[in-house]
């Protein structure tokens, strides 16, 4: 929690105003932020200086791991975060590749589970990584990336947190996640949860101990219409101790994740928080 607040304060103190062309809104911006999460000791990075809702972030992660391409699929598992980008993003609404209501196109999990090769066949990046790690193999390329510039026009949004690199040292699994852009007041809460949960979950199904998750952000920003709430409300609050995340021990394979696992298989204990803050969202 401390590193999150330090990043927020750094943006407020040192950020440079940049106009975001996609949203048309000014952003207070810094370049390069390195965060890390202690998964080994279950220090779950759920924001405590405002009420945070972790289950939607978990549901979104499950949708990515399943390769979902429709906002309706995400809604069905308890996540509404893709409704706006699928149905209210004007550039995507005008894109001839859009297949209708709720279509997201070839974004995030579609790339992770079905990357198109030059011969027209598809590569399942996630399955390759899970298979290797389950055998104790780390080829220094246990990477799942959603970043495919050749298909950007086929999706509603370029991936923000775009690459996950797993590393195995002995029987301890580590994760380094890379993010090109981060809406810190709103998006980072989700991103922290997902980095932590992804390492914990993959370690569990591959039979390893989780170590640390490292989270590297390039462009970290606060939108102009979020600044007052962050500076004058959230940053004035004292954080509470970190809660813990408990994952259903019956989740033992990628097939389990694909078929029956839900957000309710992830439980948080010891969570104390301040009142909610309703930050505006830029589509």
UniProtKB/Swiss-Prot annotation:
Keywords on this record? Cytoplasm, Methyltransferase, Nucleotide biosynthesis, Transferase
Substrates-to-products reaction catalysed: dUMP + (6R)-5,10-methylene-5,6,7,8-tetrahydrofolate = 7,8-dihydrofolate + dTMP
- InterPro entries with a match to the protein in the record: Thymidate_synth/dCMP_Mease, Thymidate_synth/dCMP_Mease_dom, Thymidate_synth/dCMP_Mease_sf, Thymidylate_synthase
Q: Which GO terms describe its molecular function?
A: thymidylate synthase activity
* Binding-site residues for dUMP, renumbered to this chain: 22, 180-183, 191, 221-223
This entry's Enzyme Commission designation comes to 2.1.1.45
Function field: Catalyzes the reductive methylation of 2'-deoxyuridine-5'-monophosphate (dUMP) to 2'-deoxythymidine-5'-monophosphate (dTMP) while utilizing 5,10-methylenetetrahydrofolate (mTHF) as the methyl donor and reductant in the reaction, yielding dihydrofolate (DHF) as a by-product. This enzymatic reaction provides an intracellular de novo source of dTMP, an essential precursor for DNA biosynthesis.
This protein is called what?
Answer: Thymidylate synthase
Please name the gene that encodes this protein: thyA
């Amino acid at each position: 929690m401390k590193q999150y607040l330090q990043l927020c304060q750094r943006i407020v103190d040192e950020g440079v105003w940049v106009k975001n062309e996609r949203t048309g809104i000014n952003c207070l911006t810094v370049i390069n932020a390195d965060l890390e999460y202690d998964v080994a000791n279950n220090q779950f990075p759920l924001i405590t200086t405002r009420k945070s809702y972790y289950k939607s972030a978990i549901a979104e992660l499950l949708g990515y791991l399943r390769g979902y391409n429709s906002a309706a699929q995400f809604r069905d598992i308890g996540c509404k975060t893709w409704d706006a980008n699928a149905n209210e993003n004007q550039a995507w609404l005008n894109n001839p590749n859009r297949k209708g209501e709720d279509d997201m196109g070839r974004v995030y999990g579609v790339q992770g589970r079905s990357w198109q090769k030059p011969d027209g066949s598809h590569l399942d990046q996630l399955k390759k990584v899970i298979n290797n790690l389950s055998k104790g193999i780390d080829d220094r390329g246990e990477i799942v990336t959603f970043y495919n510039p050749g298909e950007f026009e086929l999706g509603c949004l370029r991936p923000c947190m775009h690459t996950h690199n797993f590393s195995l040292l002995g029987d301890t699994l580590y994760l380094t996640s890379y993010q090109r852009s981060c809406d810190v007041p709103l998006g980072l809460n989700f991103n922290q949860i997902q980095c932590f949960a992804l390492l914990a979950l993959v370690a569990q199904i591959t039979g390893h101990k989780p170590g640390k998750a490292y989270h590297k952000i390039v462009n970290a920003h606060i939108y102009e219409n979020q600044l007052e709430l962050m500076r004058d409300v959230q940053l004035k609050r004292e954080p509470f101790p970190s809660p813990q995340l408990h994952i259903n021990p019956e989740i033992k394979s990628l097939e389990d994740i694909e078929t029956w696992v839900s957000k309710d298989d992830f439980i948080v204990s010891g969570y104390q928080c301040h009142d909610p803050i309703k930050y505006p969202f830029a589509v």
